[in-house]
């Protein structure tokens, strides 16, 4: 199922486009460019792939600074060429693309979709979730699927957040100390992307500083 929704959702199967919590629920963040969130649950079929590419295009056209894909999938039922095109689209996107495995510890990203972790700008997982079983990494034009020291293990096996971080698989903000509990929510993912420097030198600004009752920024 695909639906365009406002606000933050949980427990929705299929694909759902979510308005950024930053802009939808925090008026103090009004001056920030939006962060879009696309929730993907289930096997990657043609509808899912089209939804992701459409979300990237919408984020680019709408002036969003980032698109977060919240993913829970056991694999893909589309052709290898279709997945290659999707990986290429993510690699070439003019908007930052983040991947977050969630929302629960039972979440998985298995099969060819796990190769998205090698082309996204920021990647993270909720504690207890796993990624892997990538198979042979696909070849892209002008881009490489980078899975760090974990590439061989992920080919036929899987990793937890702790394992993936230690192996250099995850792309996290080096200026933030992320605990072994992982990144527990979409809101946390938005926070972790704040200050992230992209390959082109762009610095993401996803969180607005709020003054407390005494006017001191937090």
Model-predicted regions and their roles:
Residues 1-26:
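Hydrophobic secretory-pathway targeting helix
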Residues 18-218:
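Soluble extramembrane regions of membrane proteins in the secretory/endomembrane system
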């Amino acid at each position: 199922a695909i639906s365009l929704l406002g606000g933050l959702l949980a427990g929705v199967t299929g694909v759902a486009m979510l308005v950024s919590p930053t802009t939808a629920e925090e008026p103090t963040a009004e001056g920030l460019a939006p962060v879009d969130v696309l929730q993907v649950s289930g096997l990657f079929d043609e509808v899912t792939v089209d939804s992701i590419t459409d979300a990237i295009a919408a984020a680019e056209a709408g002036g969003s600074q980032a698109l977060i894909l919240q993913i829970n999938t056991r694999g893909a039922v589309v052709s290898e060429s279709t997945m290659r095109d999707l990986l290429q689209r993510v690699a070439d996107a003019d908007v930052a693309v983040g991947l977050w495995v969630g929302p629960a510890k039972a979440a998985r990203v298995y099969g060819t979709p796990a190769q998205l972790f090698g082309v996204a700008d920021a990647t993270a997982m909720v504690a207890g979730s796993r990624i892997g079983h990538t198979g042979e990494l696909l070849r892209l034009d002008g881009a490489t699927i980078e899975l760090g020291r974990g590439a061989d293990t992920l080919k036929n096996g899987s990793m937890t957040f702790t394992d993936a971080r230690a192996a250099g698989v995850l792309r996290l903000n080096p200026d933030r100390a992320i605990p072994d509990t992982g990144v527990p929510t979409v809101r946390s993912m938005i926070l972790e992307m704040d200050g992230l420097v992209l390959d082109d030198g762009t610095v993401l600004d996803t969180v607005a500083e709020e003054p407390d009752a005494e006017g001191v920024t937090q």
